[in-house]
Amino acid sequence: MSCIVAIFMTTQFSACAKSQNHKSAESKTASNVETKKQDDNANRMTYDLAFVEAHGPVHTIQYLDGDTYVFDRSGNIVTFNGYDPFTADVYGQPEKFLNKFNRDSEGRICKVVGAMFDTDYTWDGKRIVKYVRGIESGLRTREYHYGAKGLIEYATNTTEYETYEDDDPTEVTRVKEVYEYKKFDNYDNWTERTVNDEPTKRTITYYMPK
């Protein structure tokens, strides 16, 4: 009789151990899935995030010059300086100096229509490699060059002015702009950098995991 009881108890312990191991494996799998989800969010880069050189679960980006972007949880721009830039009535409200963002067939911001001038963007994957902006009596072209870490290292800024002189109708100037990064946040997004020693600072907030 004691042998039967011992066998029964051993079977119970074995079943209990298997159940605990199964639960432990399920818990570990769930933990791994959650960790991967958090890693994916930390490294996520949408076209809209790439537009402002950022990645991760970004909620807001505020530049010291006053521009503020708000993103949804999917990484899409919701508002720019408090309004929807994809439906903005630029010419209907010229006094507000609004900007209207236009997308290309892949969903990238390819043109910003302003009350004064327009800017056209050229992309290579998820990087902006060039923009062309109309300025008073001329045109400005900026070409970006990226380093191994995916950050802009320098830009070539070419400006063409109409001089209205018969012998030299166009004046062209070229300036190399060197980017240096001073501070990064916990998501490795830059928060302070200089362009030819001129500082730019921004504050970034993030969505908390659900």
Stretches with model-predicted labels:
Residues M1-V5:
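Sec-dependent N-terminal signal peptides
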Residues Q12-A15:
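C-terminal motif of bacterial Sec signal peptides marking the signal peptidase cleavage site
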Residues K18-K210:
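Buried hydrophobic residues that stabilize the cores of well-folded domains
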